[in-house]
Structure formats: structure tokens, C-alpha cells
A protein has these predicted regions:
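Residue-level signal for inorganic ion chemistry
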Residues: 32, 79, 108, 122, ...
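N-terminal phosphate/diphosphate-binding loop that engages ATP/GTP or pyrophosphate donors
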Residues: 22-87
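The conserved Walker
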Residues: 9
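Hydrophobic positions on the alpha1 helix immediately C-terminal to the Walker A/P-loop
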Residues: 16
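Conserved lysine of the Walker
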Residues: 13
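Hydrophobic anchor at the beta1->P-loop junction of P-loop NTPases
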Residues: 5
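ATP-dependent NMP and nucleoside kinases share a basic, alpha-helical "lid"
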Residues: 83-162
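Small-molecule kinase domains that catalyze NTP-dependent phosphoryl transfer to phosphate-bearing small molecules
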Residues: 67, 112-119, 126-131, 135, ...
Length: 232
């Protein structure tokens, strides 16, 4: 069973997906981390001098995998733990070099589908319910007001030691929203078969509770109450 969570940057997709997976006893797939790891690897070269074919080759030849579970889960790139290095503003600014290139996206999407074929999964990203898993059992579109999203992202960056103001973050998210909605491939789209969850003013647990209500309604026999309790 695959549950997808799509939505704009800063909506809390990773945090909510992680908690939802824990509650359900499912595995969690952070597809954004995979794109960030591929971008980090690309930045070890000179991306400005790389053709589209070279970008695709670098991504295809990069070994990206997850290690560990829960809060100790790390993302490895060619055997190196890059969990912290992929969260820098420089990586964020350059993700488009991988995410907007169809040939570079292909091996990442194939890897995501391979992972989903082996387990029950909660997966989040920008195109999970549209391009990667269009037949997912339940699809969510998680959003929040831009200001709230900016405050969440600001806290993450400040915790990581980056000095950014709230006004700068709001402007960055406005640009990111425009970019994500107008990307040539893998654009952020809200489809009719997605359940919209607005997390503005909600805690993570409250957001997850709303999602579980939807899962119970749409797939009543998929997850037993005992399994859900075990996941808490």
C-alpha cells in the first residue's frame, strides 16, 4: 500500500509523513532527500559546465540509499553520509538541475518505485501522487499559509546555523512556489483525487489525525486499529 503526500515547500511534508508512517507502522520515503543527494553529488563537479546528458549520467551512476530507521535514518551518497550537507541553501538553489531534467529524474523515480514494491510506504514530495505513484491507495495534498510555511522553514534553517530573516524566507517561498508550479517536468499539481489537508494552525499530531481519518474512510480494511496503535 502506498500513501502519497504532495504539497508546496515548507508545508511540513517530511515531518508529517514521518509521523504518519510511524503511526501506521509503514516505511517512510523522503524523495526530496534523494533529489538533494543527487544535487549534492552534481555540485562536486562544475554543474555549469555539465550538459543535460552529463547530469543524467552523474545521477545514474550515483549510489543513493537510506541507512537506519526512524530519527536515526541517514541518507548515503556513494557510501558517504550527506544527511546534513544536502540541507544547505546552495543545494536548494541547484535542485532544479536534477529535478527539471527528465533523464536525470528517471533513475530516481525508478528507485522510488522499486522501494515501494517491497513494502507499505508513506512517500512525500512534489510529484508523488501525480507522476511517480498515480495509482496510490490514498493521496494527500498538504499545504499551509505561506507565512506559516516561511516560519517553519526559517526555524529549520536557524537550527542549522543559517542566518535568514522571515521576510527573506517569505520571498524565497513565493519564488519557490512559482517555480514548482511551472516546472517543465514534475511540476507541483493538486489533482481532484487528492485529499487537501491545510495544516495552518495545526500541530503535527492534529494533521496526522486528519490524514488517518481519511485513510480509514477510503481504505477501511487496509489498516487495522491494532496496527495503528502499534505504530504510535
Amino acid at each position: 500500500m502506498v500513501i502519497t503526500i504532495d504539497g508546496p515547500a515548507g508545508a511540513g511534508k517530511s515531518t508529517v509523513a514521518r509521523k504518519l508512517a510511524q503511526r501506521l507502522g509503514f516505511d517512510y520515503l523522503d524523495t526530496g532527500a534523494m533529489y538533494r543527494a543527487a544535487t549534492w553529488k552534481l555540485l562536486q563537479a562544475d554543474p555549469d559546465d555539465c550538459s543535460a546528458e552529463e547530469v543524467a549520467r552523474i545521477v545514474a551512476e550515483t549510489d543513493i540509499r537510506f541507512s537506519g530507521k526512524g530519527p536515526d535514518r541517514r541518507i548515503m551518497c556513494d557510501g558517504r553520509d550527506v544527511s546534513g550537507e544536502i540541507r544547505t541553501p546552495r543545494v536548494t538553489r541547484n535542485i532544479y538541475r536534477v529535478a527539471d531534467e527528465p533523464a536525470a529524474r528517471k533513475p530516481l523515480i525508478e528507485a522510488q518505485r522499486e522501494i515501494a514494491g517491497r513494502r507499505n510506504l508513506v512517500t512525500e514530495g512534489r510529484d508523488q501522487g501525480t507522476d511517480v505513484f498515480p495509482d496510490a491507495s490514498v493521496k494527500f495534498y498538504l499545504t499551509a499559509s505561506r507565512r506559516e510555511r516561511a516560519m517553519r522553514r526559517l526555524q529549520d534553517l536557524q537550527d542549522a546555523g543559517h542566518d535568514v530573516s522571515l521576510e527573506e524566507m517569505v520571498e524565497q517561498l513565493a519564488r519557490r512556489d512559482h517555480e514548482d508550479n511551472s516546472r517543465p517536468v514534475g511540476a507541483l499539481r493538486k489533482e481532484d483525487d487528492m485529499e487537501v489537508v491545510d495544516s495552518t494552525g495545526l500541530t503535527v499530531d492534529e494533521t496526522v489525525d486528519r490524514m488517518i481519518e481519511t485513510i480509514d474512510r477510503e481504505c477501511p480494511d487496509a489498516i487495522s486499529k491494532s496496527e495503528r496503535r502499534a505504530g504510535k
